[in-house]
Regions:
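Conserved ATP-driven motor cores of ASCE-family P-loop NTPases powering translocation/secretion/packaging/pilus
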Residues: 54, 62-65, 114-116, 287-288, ...
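An aromatic-glycine-centered, glycine-rich loop/turn in mixed alpha/beta architecture
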Residues: 1-18
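Generic beta-strand/beta-sheet core signal
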Residues: 5, 25, 40, 49-51, ...
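Conserved P-loop NTPase motor module
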Residues: 5, 367-520
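P-loop NTPase motor domains
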Residues: 62-305, 309-312, 366, 371-377, ...
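Glycine-rich phosphate-binding loop of nucleotide-binding enzymes
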Residues: 16-101
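Short acidic loop-to-helix transition motifs that present clustered carboxylates
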Residues: 30-31, 42, 82-83, 237, ...
Length: 520
């Protein structure tokens, strides 16, 4: 193919100029020629970088929107810092949006201890260990305790290494795992510094309870079969964000390895926005600790290397190529580079794209929407002008929480899956769904009642009898202006029973708990 501009004639590979599946933009040196790519080019992965306001996100939105509407290629966006992809629902009405940290909008119900479909436990246990290590620094012996606790917990719930989630192993959640971690630690009998490290591990795990406080888990295939956005902006803790991202990426990799056939044609696109949130997970790293950022970088490198043959393209997006590391930059074949001003960033990109000196200097002077494109079908980077897709297609920069809560549909036919605990099945008021506002209130009331009446070393069952004999009055005493109801009381009982089971030394038979709740 040939493109002619003012005084330049260039030869290009086929299916690039005024052709291709996806149009990237207009060649800067041509008044009319457009450059495009084929779908399968994306299986070799893509890097999109640029400073805020340079057009990076607008381009990403346009790419994803066209992939779904024109080619029925589903995408998954993992968005750690902003809420800019939610507005795609204006163009894609069945867009799935999940908002961990803002469960009142669209809960992200994820139980990391449930293996993805058709993934054997033996494989998945290593996934769990890698994901936690990529997000949380684990001093020795914490890493060994964690590994042993994983083995013990699955064993306690009657799993075998050959089982998948369809077999008969019992489902457990983060509270069960913390209890198993504590028991494993106590059985080993560490002393001194090792004992303090183990206690710190329990505290660290308890900080994750609100993230994974459920037994059901959204199937990985649900996230891959339709356009999906997972927003993490409401989670303030960077380690927690990194953990969710690590668990998601590794669960996807395990699922794809077990369920996809490697024929190479594009099936899915995964966009990891603000990738440095995962790759910079270095908080509280001490001497002798496994460095989470190194593990996370290796995780992403492994995914980039393994998943392409299954037709899954990964797009890594960030403001700075320096923050995603040169090795990740090197593993993405296609590069779309908007305005960059920092010297190291420009140097990394220039080296990776075979730029000449003029092109490198030009990076800092690019206007919004202008970018350099480079991949294996080009001999040198091409400067392109990308369309202002959001304005052209009436897609807002973002939408309010209220707007999104009214538009999302994922949970409409799955309301019963929002019940967090097995004990909820005993409550007659909760057969079809779970009222989130009531659950939050009941959980806090149960916490207050527990703190005032129980302690960790308590073993006297008579205390439980005394508390439950006056549970209605105790619940009413903790209300502010909220209305008391039998529905609320039943929910308080569920949360209080769970606190007793996991927070005291009182052994309680499950039958007693279930009988108590059935009377609610």
């Amino acid at each position: 193919q040939i493109s002619e501009s003012e005084n330049i004639t260039k030869n290009y590979a086929d299916n690039l100029i005024n052709s291709g599946d996806i149009e990237i933009g207009i060649l800067k040196n041509s008044a009319k020629d457009k450059i495009g790519i084929s779908l399968n080019d994306l299986t070799k992965h893509m890097l999109i970088v640029g400073t805020p306001g340079s057009g990076k996100t607008t381009f990403s939105v346009s790419l994803l929107d066209r992939l779904w509407k024109e080619f029925n290629i589903p995408f998954l966006v993992i968005e750690p810092a902003k809420n800019e992809y939610r507005a795609l629902i204006q163009s894609i009405p069945d867009l799935q949006i999940f908002t961990p940290g803002k469960s009142f909008i669209s809960p992200f119900v994820f139980n990391p201890f449930v293996p993805p479909e058709n993934v054997k436990l033996e494989t998945y246990k290593s996934t769990l260990k890698t994901a936690f290590a990529a997000a949380v620094s684990m001093s020795t012996p914490l890493d060994k305790i964690f590994e042993e606790a994983i083995n013990n917990c699955y064993s306690d719930f009657r799993w075998l290494d050959t089982y998948t989630s369809k077999d008969r192993g019992g489902i457990f959640n983060i509270a069960d795992f913390i209890q198993c971690f504590q028991n494993t630690f106590d059985e080993i009998g560490y002393t001194g510094d090792a004992k303090n490290i183990g206690r710190a591990g329990v505290v660290r795990l308890r900080s994750l309870e609100n993230l994974f406080d459920n037994y059901y888990s959204i199937p990985i295939q649900d996230l891959l079969q339709k356009p999906t956005v997972i927003e993490l902006a409401a989670i303030e803790n960077s380690d927690q964000k990194a953990l969710i991202i690590s668990l998601l990426l590794l669960s996807i990799l395990a699922y794809v390895n077990s369920n996809y056939v490697g024929i190479g044609s594009l099936k899915n696109v995964i966009l990891l926005e603000e990738a440095h949130v995962l790759l910079d997970a270095t908080s509280n790293v001490g001497q002798g600790d496994a460095n989470p950022s190194v593990i996370a970088r290796n995780l992403l490198k492994r995914m980039l290397a393994e998943i392409r043959s299954y037709g899954v393209g990964i797009i890594v997006a960030d403001q700075s190529p320096r923050k995603v590391s040169t090795d990740v930059v090197a593993l993405t074949d296609m590069k779309m580079v908007f305005r960059l001003v920092e010297a190291t960033d420009k140097q990394i990109i220039a080296d990776s794209m075979n730029m000449n000196e003029m092109q490198e200097e030009r990076l800092a002077r690019l206007k919004p929407g202008e970018a350099f494109l480079f991949f294996n079908k080009l001999d040198s980077p091409e400067e392109v002008i990308t369309p202002d897709y959001r304005i052209q297609n009436n897609i807002d920069v973002t939408l309010s929480d209220q707007d999104i809560s009214e538009l999302i549909t994922y949970w409409n036919d799955k309301m019963e899956k929002l019940k967090p605990y097995p004990e909820c099945e005993e409550i007659v008021y909760c057969k079809k769904c779970c009222c989130y506002e009531r659950r939050i209130l009941a959980k806090e009331i149960a916490r207050r009642i527990f703190v005032k009446n129980f302690n960790k070393g308590m073993k006297d069952f008579e205390v439980i009898k005394g508390v439950f004999a006056k549970i209605s009055r105790l619940t009413k005493n903790e209300l502010n202006d909220e209305e008391f109801s039998q529905e609320l009381l039943a929910c308080v009982k569920v949360h209080l029973w769970r606190r007793i089971v996991y927070g005291t030394g009182i052994g309680v038979n499950k039958r007693i708990i279930h009988n108590s709740l059935r009377k609610s």
